[in-house]
Amino acid sequence: MVQSEEKEPLERYDGLKAFCNEYGFEHSYLSGTEKRERHSGDLFIVVKDRDLVDLLKQATLQQLTPGLDFGIISYNDTPLKELLAGGITTLSTDFKLMGQTMSKLIEAKGICAVANPWKLNTRKSL
């Protein structure tokens, strides 16, 4: 997982670590990709778009193709990610439903923890 901002929740990596341990995948936490060599079969889970751009630039310089030489999953889908490098796989929450839920909680003056669904949009980068 690539996560360069200190203000991002580290619990995100805890969940990934638990998943990898359960299924026998190697994992590491990276604060950036600039000094990280890519190996066949590597998968980068990228939180910030800036890190995604850096990863794609480095791949171009090393003549590597996302989805063939290594994989990328990026957080939060955007129309641009549908086009970059033939399509970037994304993991994204349902922002519309999140807004509707928040609106209802505000109207009801309610406070509670809510599990919002996530979706994996599989594209060429994976």
Which stretches of residues belong to each language-model region?
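Bacterial carbohydrate/catabolite-sensing allosteric modules
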Residues: 1-126
